[in-house]
C-alpha cells in the first residue's frame, strides 16, 4: 500500500466526507488544509437542477464578485476610435484591431480576458479557432461583446467571473484565495448564487441549487450546508 503523504493524512484526519459544513467552518478548514507552497485558490462547484442535454436549460453568464478573485487579470480589447481611448482609460492592458489580431495569430496570448465592441467582430471572428478553445472568444451573453467596452474592462478588472454549466449540469468557478476571510468567501459565493438564481431557466423544475462544494487548488472538496448561505432558495 502506498504511503500517505503528510498532506493526505491531514485531509483524512480532518475531513468528514459525509458532513455538510457551515460555510464559515468550511472556509476555515480549507485554509487549514492549504499547505501548498503557493497561495491556493478557493473553488466552488454548484450542481444545478437542469437537464444539460436541453439547450434551453443551459446556464451561462457573468457576475462581479464583491471581493474579486484575488487574481491580477490582463484584459485585451478589440475596438477603435473613441472606444479605444475609453478602454485604455478604464485600465485595458492591450487595445487594438488588426494589429492585435496579428499578435493573436502569432501566438502572443498574454491576456486573460478578451473584450470586443460590435464593430470589431469582423476582426475577432477570424480568431475563433484560436480564442474559442481557450475560452477567450468574446460573447454578448457574458458581456464581452459590448459597445460599452470601458464598463466591461472595469468589471473584468474588478473580479468579474464568467460561468457555464458543464455536461453534467455543474458550474465550476474560482471565488477567491485561501488568504481571503471567511466572510469575503461567503459574500463572493452568495453573489455567484444570486446570479445563478437570476438566470434560472424557465424550464428547470424542482430544486435548482442541488449541491454546493468548496475546494482549494490542491485540496479535498467539502460539501456546504446550503442553509448557511443566503440566496440558495431556488
From Swiss-Prot:
GO MF annotation: an example: structural constituent of ribosome
Keywords from the named record: Repressor, Ribonucleoprotein, Ribosomal protein, RNA-binding, rRNA-binding, Translation regulation, tRNA-binding
GO cellular component, one term: cytosolic large ribosomal subunit
Taxonomic superkingdom: Bacteria
Entry keyword annotation includes Isomerase: no
Keyword Ion transport carried by entry: no
A Pfam family recorded for this sequence: Ribosomal_L1
Classification via InterPro entries: Ribosom_uL1_bac-type, Ribosomal_uL1, Ribosomal_uL1-like, Ribosomal_uL1/biogenesis, Ribosomal_uL1_3-a/b-sand, Ribosomal_uL1_CS
A GO biological-process term: translation
Protein's job: Binds directly to 23S rRNA. The L1 stalk is quite mobile in the ribosome, and is involved in E site tRNA release. Protein L1 is also a translational repressor protein, it controls the translation of the L11 operon by binding to its mRNA.
Subunit structure of this chain's protein: Part of the 50S ribosomal subunit.
Family as reported in the entry's similarity comment: Belongs to the universal ribosomal protein uL1 family.
Protein name as annotated: Large ribosomal subunit protein uL1
Amino acid at each position: 500500500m502506498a504511503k500517505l503523504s503528510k498532506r493526505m493524512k491531514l485531509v483524512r484526519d480532518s475531513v468528514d466526507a459525509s458532513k455538510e459544513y457551515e460555510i464559515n467552518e468550511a472556509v476555515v478548514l480549507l485554509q487549514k488544509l492549504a499547505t501548498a507552497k503557493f497561495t491556493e485558490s478557493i473553488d466552488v462547484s454548484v450542481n444545478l437542477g437542469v437537464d444539460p442535454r436541453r439547450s434551453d436549460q443551459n446556464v451561462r453568464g457573468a457576475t462581479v464578485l464583491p471581493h474579486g478573485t484575488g487574481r491580477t487579470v490582463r484584459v485585451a480589447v478589440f475596438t477603435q476610435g473613441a472606444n479605444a481611448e475609453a478602454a485604455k482609460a478604464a485600465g485595458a492592458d492591450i487595445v487594438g484591431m488588426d494589429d492585435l489580431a496579428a499578435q493573436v495569430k502569432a501566438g502572443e496570448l498574454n491576456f486573460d480576458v478578451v473584450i470586443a465592441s460590435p464593430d470589431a467582430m469582423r476582426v475577432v471572428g477570424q480568431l475563433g479557432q484560436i480564442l474559442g478553445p481557450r475560452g477567450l472568444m468574446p460573447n454578448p451573453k457574458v458581456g464581452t461583446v459590448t459597445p460599452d467596452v470601458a464598463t466591461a474592462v472595469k468589471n473584468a478588472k474588478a473580479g468579474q467571473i464568467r460561468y457555464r454549466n458543464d455536461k453534467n449540469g455543474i458550474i465550476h468557478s474560482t471565488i477567491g484565495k485561501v488568504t481571503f476571510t471567511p466572510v469575503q468567501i461567503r459574500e463572493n459565493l452568495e453573489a455567484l448564487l444570486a446570479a445563478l438564481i437570476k438566470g434560472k431557466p424557465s424550464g428547470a423544475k424542482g430544486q435548482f441549487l442541488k449541491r454546493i462544494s468548496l475546494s482549494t487548488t490542491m485540496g479535498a472538496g467539502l460539501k456546504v450546508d446550503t442553509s448557511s448561505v443566503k440566496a440558495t432558495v431556488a
